[in-house]
């Protein structure tokens, strides 16, 4: 049902009662999911322009200049609510939707990333959600031939009733091949192509704009779309061929609000209106009414703007791929959105009012009762080795091999660096590669939304830096609870400010994304952790070898870059020892941009064998991860005057470990930023000492701990 306040505004504008179908249009297009009515004022604070930005926010995907005439299409979406109600189909159709956003811009999809957030795997329900969501992503992505090359998986009890499925997609085309969702000319036809239209996904946009009820799995299942990846693959090839032949003037994927949303937004973006004949839509089920035809979110569908003289050729092309195609309307000079069904006009609305008239507001923002519990930090553990192994065996740090082995991450033969390292790398040309990273730090963001949001950018930028890449663009997915609660809106507001400031300091534009609110569970009486997840892309030159994330050469000097601080709030170490709300979140250092630039220069010099970002689990987790094939001797005595657990497990931002056989040259590159030689790659064990501790771990002990998640899932 439409909120009463919205209904009053609509009645005043129309001068009458809206029809049932019109109410459905407003319910979906004015939903939080479609209109960003709560977050729009905040999103405007992002810097979205840059020298490489061709198309920024507002289209199905952003377009970023890459190299040698190539451009990248990039977008990020969530499919959170559907993935709780029906995890396999919810996750699968999340992949399908973002891929269609990419092809609607004229680009071929070449990569996916999947930041995922789950409750702990200690209940049958959470285990079911985890397994089915991974299967859904693998089942859809593998079938359409798009590799999942990077991702993040994070576990916390506050995601138990509301897992998060975020997806980043990247596509590639020539700049002259770009198509937009901006309508071109009145009189052009609207062709609906792809799968037939059923009742699945009906009301999906409005469903995604409210909290999950205890009965959501039964009541909301019809709102979850059902995907067919084999049809999607045909849609990809058909759409790109139609664009190559010059038949498509503008194009939009059918996602939230179905045909109604796509056709109205496409027309409005070009300053035109549209007339839709609902009867003309190819229907999967008998006796569908106008409401269902217009607003169902059946998957694998596109709407094309086609010149009248090209309609027959387009329909023939659609038929060649054994897909459904029909002329369902046309563009009009009059900026109205009208829908006809069985000879009766059931929708007649000013199109700008429908697509852009949702009232936006900056909600009340109040800081919550402080989350930090002073004095609750865990004591220094008596057995540091046991603590070390406990932290690196945490599922948030441990290898995600069980997940990414289910993905075909080498399809299309572009993958240079496979999943499991700091960033994915794809070959675009013989000389240039695309570097990708994604993720978030939810626990830190809960305690300090500003610094948490800022550090999301810094950490992901460092993931690119250790491969020698600087950032080209950022997309985001802002996952939060109910914004009507002042403390939740405060989290959202400050996370956005931190994320925006971090991106500006690194001169990386924020070019698009998604807002997913109302992520709360009636069943568990919880809101998710504030989760401003991002995807970031960069460019790397293949003229010098890319550093590995793992120690590669015995005898290499190990260099710590950046400053290690005592603040441990939001860290994985604190979480492992039941101190979730203790401590202060480390601030991003003012010289973070300079540190990242220095790491990029070092990686590009060709003098690094290995390089690894430090984040969750700190130096301990970083060393353990790098010791995959070789041991190391490390001395932290001179790093700083910190306790043993602070030295080992601090997650202070803007830090990295580098390994090189030419330390003098690398130290010269790092001379203007904090750095220190802390050890050497050697032996078959990891030996770490400080002023008052020594730890020795065999490579087998490290491997067993680091493979904890894979061993648990394979048991």
From Swiss-Prot:
**UniProt binding sites for substrate:** 78-81, 100, 225, 297-299, 516
A Pfam short name: AIRS_C
Cellular compartments annotated: Cytoplasm
| CDD domains according to UniProt | PurL_repeat1, PurL_repeat2
Reactions catalysed:
N(2)-formyl-N(1)-(5-phospho-beta-D-ribosyl)glycinamide + L-glutamine + ATP + H2O = 2-formamido-N(1)-(5-O-phospho-beta-D-ribosyl)acetamidine + L-glutamate + ADP + phosphate + H(+)
InterPro entries for this protein: PRibForGlyAmidine_synth_PurL, PurL_linker, PurM-like_C_dom, PurM-like_C_sf, PurM-like_N, PurM-like_N_sf
Enumerate the active-site residues. 33, 79
EC class (word): ligase
The EC number of this protein is 6.3.5.3
- Which Cys pairs does UniProt list as disulfide-bonded? none
Statement: the UniProt record of this protein carries the keyword Ligase = yes
Please tell me where Mg(2+) 1 binds in this chain.
Answer: 77, 514
State the function annotated in the UniProt record: Part of the phosphoribosylformylglycinamidine synthase complex involved in the purines biosynthetic pathway. Catalyzes the ATP-dependent conversion of formylglycinamide ribonucleotide (FGAR) and glutamine to yield formylglycinamidine ribonucleotide (FGAM) and glutamate. The FGAM synthase complex is composed of three subunits. PurQ produces an ammonia molecule by converting glutamine to glutamate. PurL transfers the ammonia molecule to FGAR to form FGAM in an ATP-dependent manner.
Q: How does it assemble?
A: Monomer. Part of the FGAM synthase complex composed of 1 PurL, 1 PurQ and 2 PurS subunits.
Name used for this protein in its record? Phosphoribosylformylglycinamidine synthase subunit PurL
Q: Which organism is it from?
A: Methanosarcina barkeri (strain Fusaro / DSM 804)
The gene name reads: purL
């Amino acid at each position: 049902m439409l909120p009463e306040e919205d209904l009053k505004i609509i009645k005043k504008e129309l001068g009458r009662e809206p029809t049932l179908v019109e109410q459905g249009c407003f319910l979906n297009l004015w939903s939080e999911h479609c209109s960003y009515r709560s977050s729009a004022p905040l999103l405007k604070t992002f810097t979205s322009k840059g020298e490489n930005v061709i198309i920024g926010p507002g289209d199905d995907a952003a377009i970023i200049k890459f190299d040698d005439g190539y451009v990248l299409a990039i977008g990020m979406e969530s499919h959170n609510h559907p993935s709780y109600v029906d995890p396999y189909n919810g996750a699968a159709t999340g992949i399908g939707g973002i891929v269609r956003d990419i092809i609607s811009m004229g680009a071929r999809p070449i990569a996916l990333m999947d930041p995922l957030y789950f409750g702990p795997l200690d209940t049958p329900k959470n285990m079911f959600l985890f397994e089915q969501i991974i299967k859904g992503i693998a089942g859809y992505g593998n079938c359409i031939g798009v590799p999942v090359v990077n991702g993040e998986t994070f576990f916390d009890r506050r995601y138990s009733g509301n897992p998060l499925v975020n997806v980043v997609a990247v596509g590639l085309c020539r700049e002259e091949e770009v198509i937009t969702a901006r309508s071109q000319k009145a009189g052009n036809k609207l062709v609906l192509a792809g799968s037939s239209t059923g009742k699945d996904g009906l009301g999906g946009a409005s469903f995604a704009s409210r909290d999950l009820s205890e009965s959501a799995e039964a009541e909301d299942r019809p709102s979850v779309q059902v995907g067919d990846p084999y049809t999607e693959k045909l849609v990809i090839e058909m759409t790109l061929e139609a664009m190559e032949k010059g038949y498509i003037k503008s194009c939009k994927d059918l996602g939230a609000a179905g045909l109604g949303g796509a056709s109205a937004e496409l027309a409005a973006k070009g300053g035109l209106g549209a007339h839709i004949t609902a009867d003309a839509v190819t229907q999967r089920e008998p006796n569908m009414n106008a409401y269902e035809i217009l607003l169902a979110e059946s998957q694998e569908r596109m709407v094309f703007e086609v010149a009248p003289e090209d309609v027959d050729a387009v329909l023939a092309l659609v038929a060649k791929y054994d897909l459904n195609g029909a002329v369902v309307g046309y563009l009009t000079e009059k900026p109205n959105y009208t829908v006809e069904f069985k000879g009766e006009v059931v929708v007649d609305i000013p199109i700008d009012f429908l697509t852009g008239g949702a009232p936006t507001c900056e909600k009340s923002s109040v800081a919550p009762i402080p989350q930090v519990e002073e004095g609750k930090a865990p004591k220094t553990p008596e057995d540091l080795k046991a603590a070390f192994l406990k932290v690196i065996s945490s599922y948030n740090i441990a290898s995600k091999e069980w997940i990414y082995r289910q993905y075909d991450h080498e399809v299309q033969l572009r993958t240079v660096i496979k999943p499991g390292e700091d960033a994915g790398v794809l070959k675009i040309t013989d000389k240039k590669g695309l570097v990708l990273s994604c993720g978030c730090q939810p626990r830190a963001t809960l305690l300090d939304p500003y610094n948490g949001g800022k550090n999301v950018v810094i950490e992901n930028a460092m993931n690119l830096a250790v491969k020698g890449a600087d950032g080209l663009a950022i997309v985001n997915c802002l996952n939060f609870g109910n914004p009507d609660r002042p403390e939740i809106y405060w989290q959202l507001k400050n996370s956005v400010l931190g994320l925006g400031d971090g991106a500006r300091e690194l001169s990386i534009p924020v070019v698009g994304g998604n807002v997913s609110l109302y992520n709360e569970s009636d069943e568990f009486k919880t809101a998710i952790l504030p989760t401003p997840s991002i995807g970031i892309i960069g460019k790397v030159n293949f003229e010098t070898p890319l550093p590995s994330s793992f120690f590669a050469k015995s005898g290499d000097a190990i260099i710590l870059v950046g400053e290690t601080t005592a603040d441990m709030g939001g860290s994985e170490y604190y979480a492992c020892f039941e101190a979730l709300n203790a401590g202060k979140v480390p601030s991003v250092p003012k010289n973070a941009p300079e540190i990242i630039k220095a790491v990029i220069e070092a990686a590009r010099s060709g003098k690094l064998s290995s390089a690894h970002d430090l984040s969750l689990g700190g130096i301990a987790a970083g060393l353990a991860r790098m010791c995959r094939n070789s041991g190391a001797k490390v001395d932290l005595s001179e790093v700083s005057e910190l306790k043993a657990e602070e030295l080992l497990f601090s997650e202070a931002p803007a830090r990295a470990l580098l390994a090189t056989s030419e330390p003098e040259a690398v130290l010269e590159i790092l001379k203007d930023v904090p750095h220190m030689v802390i050890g050497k790659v050697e032996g078959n064990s990891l030996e770490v000492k400080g002023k008052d501790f020594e730890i020795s771990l065999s490579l087998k002990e490290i491997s067993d701990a680091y493979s904890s998640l894979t061993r648990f899932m394979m048991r």
